[in-house]
A protein has these predicted regions:
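Proteins enriched for Cys/Gly/acidic motifs involved in redox and nucleic-acid/cofactor modification
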Residues: 1-152
Length: 152
C-alpha cells in the first residue's frame, strides 16, 4: 500500500510523521509524496489557533477531494479536541486520538486492512439492544464488514 503523510502545526507533528513513515515501511508499505497516487492518506492536524483549525479542516477536505478513493486517517490535536466535527468531514475513515498516536501505523493496519468500514461501525453502542426493546441489530452493509462478529 502506498501512503501519503501530511502534517500541520508544530515540530512534534513533523517528528511523528517521520516515525510513522519508518513504522509503515517496517510493515511493508511504501511512502509517496504524491497524494493523488496514495492508497492511504494520513493527516496530522493542529488546533493551537483558530486559523490552524481552519487549515486542518481545509486540508482534510482538499485531500479527500483530490483522491476520494484513498482511505483517509486523521490524527492530531484538531482531531482529538473535535472528534465529532472531524469525523463528520467527508472522506474520514479513521480518527486516531492523540493518546494512541504512537500506535497509528498498527491501528491503521488492523482497523482498515479488511475493507472500507469505519471503526465506529462495529463498536458496541452506548445502550445495549435489549434496553431499547429491540430484538434485532442493524448492520450498515454499505460500510462493509471486517468479519469480526460472532455471525462470521
Amino acid at each position: 500500500m502506498q501512503i501519503h503523510l501530511k502534517t500541520l502545526g508544530c515540530r512534534l507533528n513533523e517528528a511523528e510523521l517521520e516515525t510513522w513513515a519508518r513504522q509503515f515501511r517496517q510493515l511493508g508499505h511504501g511512502i509517496t509524496t504524491d497524494p493523488d497516487t496514495a492508497d492511504l492518506l494520513v493527516i496530522n492536524t493542529c488546533a493551537v489557533t483558530e486559523e490552524a483549525v481552519r487549515k486542518s479542516r481545509r486540508l482534510i477536505r482538499r485531500t479527500h477531494n483530490s483522491n476520494p478513493q484513498a482511505k483517509l486517517v486523521v490524527s492530531g490535536c484538531y482531531a482529538s479536541l473535535n472528534p465529532g466535527e472531524t469525523g463528520d468531514l467527508p472522506g474520514v475513515d479513521l480518527l486516531i486520538d492523540n493518546r494512541e498516536k504512537d500506535q497509528l501505523p498498527s491501528l491503521v493496519n488492523t482497523q482498515l486492512a479488511d475493507g472500507t468500514m469505519p471503526v465506529i461501525a462495529t463498536e458496541p453502542g452506548e445502550n445495549p439492544l435489549f434496553s431499547r426493546g429491540r430484538q434485532r441489530a442493524f448492520i450498515k452493509v454499505q460500510d462493509g464488514c471486517r468479519y469480526q462478529c460472532t455471525f462470521c
